């Protein structure tokens, strides 16, 4: 065991309290759990690129998807359950992953997952340099390998992730596959499935509305679920907003008058696949003055709704340490990001302006309407894990929501006293009909699931 080797490697020193040292060692060893799994040969292959051989530590299955990388130091349970990673093979740049295990699916007082961003592991595959078979954390209930195997997600360790990331950075995000227990046939290009050709949002969005009540509700926000993260919902509910979450293609403009605000969530894939969402948002802005806030894919869909364009980045931004400049104040925030597309700021209409800009690559990180309470960010102000420099944006948004509610109550005094036709008390309390990742083993199966 690593922990045992650690203590054996410590130089022996005379101590006035040998029993104390022994107690500390025994207590430390008691927190370390073994999550060893049987290893099998595995191969990570980049289409038209290098091949890497390693060891399997997840599910015994073959998958393909888009290979992307994250430089995040911590937060692998949150990253791997983020619906934005649906259909992607996630390469971790950190040399050791899994050392604090995987926590349970415990829920908080709002009925939201405390440690995961969705109920299931969302990434199609996992690539690491080294995986920790022994793990230690008070919340851990299983190892990373056990979790991947249980969720049906293949994972590979013992590969040169530095070489992989260098290739992806220079050549751009590429299609790749993980094969377990067999050699890759270079002639089988049909084995590479491009998730960009699949409507991934349709897979991860709730299939029916659900409702989460705040402990002390002050307003009611409609959330458009394109693959929403649990901590986004928590960031709204913990600030006094009860939320009703709708499928990505729900005609939100038809029910917006029952809400005090509309929120558009993050999600996976190409934003142009969600044309119906963009259309409903456009109709919403034409027919209502309700405050709107979008994050990540929600930012991109809002841009499409106002006639702007989106572009695909070479290798995307996926990290917890990306600087974004607030163009209205000149302040810089360290932000958490996970996206492969960006908004082309040069295509924004005249009544909109850029809100944030990425100080690494100068890509757009946000936009804001010049006169209406509508704004969006490409980064994640709710970051989990990651910095919370920009979490105040939720406060700005909900302040505008409360002001809108007050103005509507002034014009319509009976608005809040009338029974709601939404019957939110009868709605589900969690996501409806969202299935675990299918890996992308088969195009037909993926299309059918979509």
UniProtKB/Swiss-Prot annotation:
<dbReference type="GO" id="GO:0006221">
    <property type="term" value="P:pyrimidine nucleotide biosynthetic process"/>
</dbReference>
<dbReference type="Pfam" id="PF00117">
    <property type="entry name" value="GATase"/>
</dbReference>
<dbReference type="GO" id="GO:0005951">
    <property type="term" value="C:carbamoyl-phosphate synthase complex"/>
</dbReference>
<feature type="transit peptide" description="Mitochondrion">
    <location>
        <begin position="1"/>
        <end position="29"/>
    </location>
</feature>
<keyword id="KW-0809">Transit peptide</keyword>
<feature type="active site" description="Nucleophile">
    <location>
        <position position="296"/>
    </location>
</feature>
<dbReference type="InterPro" id="IPR017926">
    <property type="entry name" value="GATASE"/>
</dbReference>
<dbReference type="GO" id="GO:0005524">
    <property type="term" value="F:ATP binding"/>
</dbReference>
<dbReference type="InterPro" id="IPR029062">
    <property type="entry name" value="Class_I_gatase-like"/>
</dbReference>
<feature type="active site">
    <location>
        <position position="380"/>
    </location>
</feature>
<dbReference type="GO" id="GO:0006526">
    <property type="term" value="P:L-arginine biosynthetic process"/>
</dbReference>
<dbReference type="InterPro" id="IPR036480">
    <property type="entry name" value="CarbP_synth_ssu_N_sf"/>
</dbReference>
<keyword id="KW-0496">Mitochondrion</keyword>
<keyword id="KW-0067">ATP-binding</keyword>
<dbReference type="GO" id="GO:0004088">
    <property type="term" value="F:carbamoyl-phosphate synthase (glutamine-hydrolyzing) activity"/>
</dbReference>
<dbReference type="InterPro" id="IPR035686">
    <property type="entry name" value="CPSase_GATase1"/>
</dbReference>
<dbReference type="GO" id="GO:0005759">
    <property type="term" value="C:mitochondrial matrix"/>
</dbReference>
<dbReference type="InterPro" id="IPR006274">
    <property type="entry name" value="CarbamoylP_synth_ssu"/>
</dbReference>
<protein>
    <recommendedName>
        <fullName>Carbamoyl phosphate synthase arginine-specific small chain</fullName>
        <ecNumber>6.3.5.5</ecNumber>
    </recommendedName>
</protein>
<feature type="domain" description="Glutamine amidotransferase type-1">
    <location>
        <begin position="220"/>
        <end position="407"/>
    </location>
</feature>
<dbReference type="Pfam" id="PF00988">
    <property type="entry name" value="CPSase_sm_chain"/>
</dbReference>
<comment type="subunit">
    <text>Heterodimer composed of 2 chains; the small (or glutamine) chain promotes the hydrolysis of glutamine to ammonia, which is used by the large (or ammonia) chain to synthesize carbamoyl phosphate.</text>
</comment>
<keyword id="KW-0436">Ligase</keyword>
<feature type="active site">
    <location>
        <position position="382"/>
    </location>
</feature>
<keyword id="KW-0028">Amino-acid biosynthesis</keyword>
<keyword id="KW-0055">Arginine biosynthesis</keyword>
<comment type="pathway">
    <text>Amino-acid biosynthesis; L-arginine biosynthesis; carbamoyl phosphate from bicarbonate: step 1/1.</text>
</comment>
<keyword id="KW-0547">Nucleotide-binding</keyword>
<dbReference type="GO" id="GO:0006207">
    <property type="term" value="P:'de novo' pyrimidine nucleobase biosynthetic process"/>
</dbReference>
<comment type="function">
    <text>Small subunit of the arginine-specific carbamoyl phosphate synthase (CPSase). CPSase catalyzes the formation of carbamoyl phosphate from the ammonia moiety of glutamine, carbonate, and phosphate donated by ATP, the first step of the arginine biosynthetic pathway. The small subunit (glutamine amidotransferase) binds and cleaves glutamine to supply the large subunit with the substrate ammonia.</text>
</comment>
<comment type="similarity">
    <text>Belongs to the CarA family.</text>
</comment>
<dbReference type="InterPro" id="IPR002474">
    <property type="entry name" value="CarbamoylP_synth_ssu_N"/>
</dbReference>
<dbReference type="GO" id="GO:0004359">
    <property type="term" value="F:glutaminase activity"/>
</dbReference>
<dbReference type="GO" id="GO:0006541">
    <property type="term" value="P:glutamine metabolic process"/>
</dbReference>
<keyword id="KW-0315">Glutamine amidotransferase</keyword>
């Amino acid at each position: 065991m690593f922990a045992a080797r650690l203590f054996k490697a410590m130089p022996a020193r005379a101590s006035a309290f040998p029993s104390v040292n022994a107690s500390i060692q025994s207590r430390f060893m008691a927190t370390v759990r073994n999550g060893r799994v049987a290893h099998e040969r595995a191969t990570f292959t980049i289409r038209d690129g290098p091949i890497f051989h390693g060891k399997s530590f997840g599910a015994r299955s073959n998958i393909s998807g888009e290979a992307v990388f994250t430089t995040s130091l911590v937060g692998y349970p949150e990253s791997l359950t983020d619906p934005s990673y649906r259909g992607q093979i996630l390469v971790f740049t950190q040399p050791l992953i899994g050392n604090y295990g995987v926590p349970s699916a415990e829920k908080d007082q709002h009925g939201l997952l405390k440690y995961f961003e969705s109920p299931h592991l969302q990434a199609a595959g996992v690539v690491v340099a080294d995986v920790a078979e022994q793990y230690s954390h008070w919340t851990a209930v299983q190892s990373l390998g056990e979790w991947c195997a249980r969720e049906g997600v293949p994972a590979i360790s013992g590969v040169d992730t530095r070489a992989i990331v260098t290739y992806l950075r220079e050549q751009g995000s590429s299609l790749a596959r993980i094969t377990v227990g067999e050699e890759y046939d270079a002639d089988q290009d049909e084995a590479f499935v491009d998730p960009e050709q699949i409507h991934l949002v349709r897979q991860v969005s709730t299939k029916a509305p659900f409702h989460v009540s705040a402990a002390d509700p002050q307003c009611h926000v409609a959330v458009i679920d394109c693959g929403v993260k649990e901590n986004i919902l928590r960031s709204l509910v913990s600030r006094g907003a009860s939320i009703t979450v709708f499928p990505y293609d729900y005609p939100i403009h038809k029910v917006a008058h029952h809400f005090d605000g509309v929120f558009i969530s993050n999600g996976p894939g190409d934003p142009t696949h969600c044309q119906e969402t963009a259309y409903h948002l456009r109709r919403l802005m034409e027919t209502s003055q309700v405050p709107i806030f979008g994050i990540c894919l929600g930012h991109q869909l809002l841009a499409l709704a106002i006639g702007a364009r989106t572009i695909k980045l070479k290798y995307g931004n996926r990290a917890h340490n990306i600087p974004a400049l607030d163009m209205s104040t000149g302040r810089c925030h360290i932000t958490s990001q996970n996206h492969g597309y960006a908004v082309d700021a040069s295509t924004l209409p005249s009544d909109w302006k850029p809100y944030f800009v990425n100080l690494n690559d100068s890509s757009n990180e946000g936009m804001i309407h010049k006169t209406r309470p509508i704004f969006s960010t490409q980064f994640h102000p709710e970051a989990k894990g990651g910095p919370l420099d920009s979490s105040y944006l939720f406060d700005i948004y909900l302040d505008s929501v409360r002001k809108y509610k007050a103005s509507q109550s002034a014009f319509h005094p009976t608005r809040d006293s009338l029974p709601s036709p939404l019957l939110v008390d009868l709605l589900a309390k969690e996501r409806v009909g969202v299935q675990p990742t299918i890996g992308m083993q088969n195009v037909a199966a993926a299309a059918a699931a979509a």
